[in-house]
Structures are given as structure tokens and as C-alpha cells.
């Protein structure tokens, strides 16, 4: 797939937002943003009869009936329906309230989560619903996310109604905007309403940034994130909610994070978040951040989970000189990224230089060389971080298989047979039968130059990690799950390299 096939400039799936309200005067849509005028259509020609014989039957033609409604109902929309028609469609039976709806009208998708409300001192149930019009092609998890946002807003409005009659007041102002002497009910209602402006601001924030964090009517806190759109805006390959949830589920203490933008919390935020962010660094793992900050590892996981789900960070492996990187295979907006890197680094180093160095794959220390001036080392380190942040580099990890030696391999020829204790360990292990004999010979040959206890330790570790040597677990995961030292486990793999096949690929959880 070429970069041209991926639209990194795509807009959000959000197309419009409407406020549906029922009250004493009936149902109506009191707000639509943005209000786009209906597209002009060519005038239709009256069908002509196929015969001059007036008695011959002519095929009937369906025509749209003029909507007789008034006020908000007579306002035309881009959806080939007036607001009155849409209000009739959106009205939900009371039994279906407090549940999401998802419908298509004229190939346009509408989602919402209607809620019921009551006027103070009355028993009649009315409805409030924030309806989102979504573009074609959005995935189900995106539609579900906007249903959740609709529910959050509606719940907030109902709560405000219970506190001080908020929706009663809005309904009264909507009735005033529909008076016969007022030709533009939407504009009239917007002059007094406390709903219209917040909905417009939310719409713009989602389209511009992909997420919302604000107080509705300066009273109720609301949060929302369209993950794929937010990542696209940050020039990162977009991921949906399901992909991000899968990453969160597989997150381990040996992972690290890279912040995608300035996420320093507001003054009223939890001070633990600020404390953790002050210890956040590309060369630190989650466990390192927990140790340095003194925050329990579980709490660190919860904060990082929040950052990932709100597209404020991506998961990486901590920077280390032995890390192996290569240029990413996913399509990238190279022209836009070149401009961004030029603005950040100027003429000191070019984007292409960083990408070219790691193709073919190389370790980090070959790029950030110790013989370079400290300033140059710092610039190159920042370049690598920027490339990782925008997922233009990916790290390759070492994976392992246990395989029978090749036919041309030089097999061990020990002078003494393998001890019975070692043979028993090998026979009771999960090692493939076709390599057990070779492993026994390797142990016997090792005893010629190494102590018995050392060989037993090496064999025991090899047998212990063998179930994970199936090509699905890389070195870091093997080391972590078995609580082993990296140098020691690498020594074990070297000792039994005759029956081990290795290969490198990305860890798709983090990439």
C-alpha cells in the first residue's frame, strides 16, 4: 500500500449534531450545527404520457409532499428532509428510551441515546436526545462512541433539569422562537439557549482535535475521544478503540510510553498524575517510572491506560543502545512530516538521514555514537524519539524457535555420556523429541569445561523457557515472565544455539 492510498488528512466521521427536544408543545429539533443549506437540484420535468390517447393509463410518479409544519419544523436541511420530518423520525417510544439508536435515512447515519425528563411538579415524561449525523464508512465502535457521548450529554442535561428546571426553560425559549412573527427559529433560539453554543463548541473540538474535555454549562464535566481521528490529527497511524483496548490489555511493566503532545494536567487534576508525568521519559519502563515516582505499579497502569485511551501517548519499549530499529512499513505522510521535522530540527539533521540509517535495521548505538559531540548526540536522540512518536521507526525484537539442527550442522561429540540426572530433566521436559538427544550431547560436552552445577543451571533455565520458544514470545517477554536476568538468559540461548532458530520482527502490541 502506498502512502497516497491512505488519507491522512481525512476529517472526522462527525458530520453534524442536533438537539431533539420534546415538551408540552410537542417534539422538535431546536438546534442543528452546522446548518448546511440543502443542495440545489435540477427542476424535475413533468412526465409525459407515452400515448396521445387520454384513456391510456400512465405510470404513477412519487412526489415529495410539502411539510405543513411550522416554526422549527419548516426549516430545510441537507438531508432532503425538514427538521419537522427529522423530529418525527427521531421521536422514540418511551419504552425505547435510555437505550442507543442507530438508523440510516437517505444513506445518512444518525446515532443518539434518548433520555426522558420531567417538568418539576409534573408526572409526564418528555424526551431529550443529542443526535449525531455520521459520515458513511465509520466503523461500529465509532458509532457506539458517539452514542456514549450522546448519553453523557443527555444525562447532564437531565441532571441540570432536576437541579433548576434547565430543560423547562429551554423548552419555553424554543416555543418563543416558533412564534409566527419570527422567520428564523434556529437563530432566535440560539440567542437565549444555553445548549446551542456548547454543542457547536463540542463539534468543532472533535473535528479539530478528536477529543473533548470541558464543563457543560460550567457545571458538568464531559470527556470524549474519537481515537482514530485524534491519532490522525497527531500524524500517527490511526487506531480504533478496539485496537487501543487490545494494546492496553497486553501492556506489561517492561513497556514504556511516548507522550504525543503536551499533556500536563490542569491545576485541579490529581497530583499523582503530575508526579508520574514528571518521571516519564523515553528510556524508562513503566516499572522504572513506578519505582522513581513511588507510585504503586497498579496506579501507574491506570494512569497510562487513561493516556493511551485518550490518544495522549503511544506504547513503546524504553530506549536502549542495543535496541534494533528499522523504518516502518506502514504508509506515512512523508511530505508533511518532512516539513514538521524541518521546523523542529532546522538544518542540523534531516528526516531522511534518520530513516536511511535504520534501513537495513541497526542498533541505536550506531546512530547515537559516543564519539560524537554531546550536542550532536542529543539532536540524534531527539530525532529518534520524534520518529518513534510518529511511528516512522519500529523496533525489531528477537523471537525464538526450537528446531532440529540442519543436516550440515557440526554436532557435539562428548567424551562422556550425559549424566542420568540431566537425561531425566531432558526427558521430562516439553522439548521436541527430535532435539532431546542433541541437547543431552550439548550438556555432556559442556561438562568438559564447565562445572556440574553451572551446566545444570543452564539446562534447567533452557527447559523452563522452552514452552515460550514457539515464535510468539520475544526476549523481553521471556525474561519478564520467568523473572530472569537478560545476560543470563542470553547466555543460555548461546549455549543451546545449535537447536535454536532466531528471527526478528516487530512486537505488534507496541507498534
UniProtKB/Swiss-Prot annotation:
InterPro entries to which the protein is assigned, alphabetical: HTH_NPRL3, Npr3
Keywords recorded for this protein, A-Z: Lysosome, Membrane
GO BP terms: cellular response to amino acid starvation; negative regulation of TORC1 signaling; positive regulation of autophagy
Lineage of origin: Eukaryota, Metazoa, Ecdysozoa, Nematoda, Chromadorea
Any one GO CC term of the record: lysosomal membrane
Name under which the protein is recorded: GATOR complex protein NPRL3
Function: As a component of the GATOR complex may function in the amino acid-sensing branch of the TORC1 signaling pathway.
Top-level taxon of the source organism: Eukaryota
UniProt family annotation: Belongs to the NPR3 family.
Subcellular location: Lysosome membrane
Organism: Caenorhabditis elegans
Disordered: annotated span: 37-58
Transmembrane segment boundaries: none
Description of how the protein assembles with itself and partners: Probably part of the GATOR complex.
Amino acid at each position: 500500500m502506498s502512502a497516497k492510498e491512505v488519507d491522512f488528512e481525512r476529517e472526522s466521521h462527525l458530520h453534524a449534531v442536533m438537539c431533539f427536544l420534546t415538551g408540552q408543545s410537542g417534539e422538535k429539533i431546536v438546534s442543528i450545527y452546522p446548518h448546511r443549506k440543502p443542495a440545489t437540484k435540477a427542476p424535475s420535468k413533468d412526465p409525459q404520457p407515452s400515448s396521445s390517447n387520454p384513456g391510456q393509463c400512465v405510470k404513477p410518479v412519487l412526489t415529495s409532499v410539502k411539510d405543513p409544519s411550522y416554526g422549527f419544523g419548516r426549516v430545510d436541511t441537507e438531508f432532503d428532509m425538514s427538521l419537522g420530518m427529522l423530529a418525527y423520525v427521531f421521536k422514540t417510544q418511551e419504552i425505547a428510551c435510555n437505550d442507543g439508536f442507530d438508523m440510516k435515512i437517505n444513506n445518512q447515519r444518525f446515532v443518539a441515546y434518548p433520555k426522558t425528563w420531567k417538568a418539576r411538579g409534573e408526572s409526564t415524561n418528555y424526551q431529550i436526545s443529542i443526535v449525531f449525523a455520521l459520515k458513511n464508512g465509520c466503523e461500529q465502535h465509532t458509532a457506539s462512541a458517539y452514542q456514549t457521548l450522546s448519553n453523557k450529554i443527555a444525562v447532564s442535561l437531565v441532571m441540570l433539569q432536576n437541579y433548576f428546571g434547565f430543560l423547562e426553560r429551554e423548552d419555553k425559549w424554543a416555543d418563543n422562537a416558533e412564534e409566527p412573527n419570527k422567520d428564523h427559529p434556529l437563530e432566535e433560539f440560539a440567542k437565549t439557549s444555553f445548549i446551542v453554543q456548547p454543542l457547536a463548541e463540542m463539534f468543532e473540538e472533535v473535528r479539530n482535535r478528536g477529543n473533548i474535555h470541558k464543563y457543560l454549562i460550567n457545571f458538568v464535566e464531559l470527556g470524549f475521544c474519537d481515537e482514530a481521528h485524534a491519532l490522525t490529527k497527531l500524524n500517527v497511524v490511526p487506531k480504533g478503540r478496539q485496537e487501543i483496548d487490545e494494546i492496553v490489555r497486553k501492556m506489561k511493566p517492561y513497556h514504556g510510553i511516548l507522550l504525543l503532545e503536551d499533556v500536563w494536567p490542569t491545576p485541579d487534576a490529581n497530583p499523582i498524575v503530575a508526579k508520574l508525568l514528571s518521571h516519564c521519559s523515553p528510556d524508562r519502563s513503566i516499572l522504572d517510572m513506578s519505582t522513581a515516582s513511588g507510585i504503586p505499579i497498579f496506579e501507574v497502569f491506570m494512569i497510562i491506560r487513561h493516556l493511551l485511551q485518550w490518544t495522549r501517548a503511544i506504547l513503546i519499549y524504553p530506549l536502549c543502545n542495543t535496541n534494533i530499529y528499522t523504518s516502518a512499513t506502514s504508509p506515512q505522510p512523508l511530505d508533511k512530516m518532512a516539513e514538521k521535522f524541518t521546523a523542529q530540527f532546522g538544518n542540523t539533521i534531516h528526516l531522511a538521514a534518520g530513516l536511511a540509517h535504520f534501513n537495513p535495521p541497526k542498533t541505536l548505538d550506531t546512530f547515537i555514537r559516543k564519539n560524537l559531540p554531546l550536542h550532536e548526540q542529543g539532536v540524534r536522540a531527539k530525532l529518534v524519539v520524534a520518529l518513534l512518536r510518529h511511528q516512522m521507526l519500529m523496533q525489531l525484537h528477537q523471537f525464538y524457535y526450537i528446531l532440529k539442527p540442519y543436516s550440515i550442522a557440526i554436532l557435539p561429540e562428548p567424551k562422556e555420556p550425559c549424566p542420568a540426572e540431566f537425561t531425566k530433566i531432558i526427558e521430562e521436559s516439553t522439548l521436541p523429541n527430535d532435539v532431546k538427544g542433541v541437547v543431552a550431547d550439548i550438556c555432556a560436552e559442556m561438562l568438559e569445561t564447565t562445572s556440574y552445577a553451572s551446566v545444570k543451571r543452564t539446562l534447567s533455565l533452557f527447559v523452563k523457557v522452552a514452552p515460550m520458544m514457539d515464535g510468539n514470545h520475544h526476549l523481553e517477554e521471556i525474561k519478564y515472565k520467568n523473572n530472569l536476568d537478560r545476560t543470563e538468559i542470553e547466555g543460555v540461548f548461546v549455549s543451546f544455539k545449535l537447536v535454536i532458530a532466531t528471527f526478528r520482527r516487530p512486537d505488534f502490541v507496541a507498534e
